[in-house]
């Protein structure tokens, strides 16, 4: 089943990418993309930014106003300051709640699309051979092992294929990581070698020699 082979491999690649990048990082990226779209939520964020700007403006004016010399103006700014602060806190709490629900929704979809399929597919297709081994090339115990748990003898089970894909993806990731570290190390060493060393001038060197002779 070529389509199932590719699906299992794709799922393992996706799981490894998520583990490498981080679920929180992916959620934050999707949240920013969603906020960039022309939705009601993006309008709420625009309102929050405007409230924040108004609040900071009133706060600066309040700090620059004396409560003794200009009490009436100070009291008016103080009321505006408290009102804007209350609105800003309510808006922030509402958006934080929306962000929490968004994270739960995305986490659920991601789990179903990755970990959920990792458990469901091997169970559902446990008896389906992924592909057949060449007849007589492998001993009995090897054929039994790769067909475990319920695939026909002489075939590769979905569990064995999934395990092989996981090992291959991890191996490729480690190789890429090692290559990146090696290249970065080579660049740093080349930069260090390219730094010019200040040469000692002839007069200074001769002065040092004369000083040594006098000693």
Swiss-Prot record:
Keywords recorded for this protein, A-Z: Coiled coil, Endoplasmic reticulum, Membrane, Transmembrane, Transmembrane helix, Transport
Transmembrane segments: 5-24, 111-131, 156-172
Residue ranges the record marks as coiled coil: 72-104
Stretches assigned to the Lumenal side: 1-4, 132-155
Annotated function: Required for the post-translational delivery of tail-anchored (TA) proteins to the endoplasmic reticulum. Acts as a membrane receptor for soluble GET3, which recognizes and selectively binds the transmembrane domain of TA proteins in the cytosol.
Family that this chain belongs to: Belongs to the WRB/GET1 family.
Name this protein carries in UniProt: Protein GET1
Gene that this sequence comes from: GET1
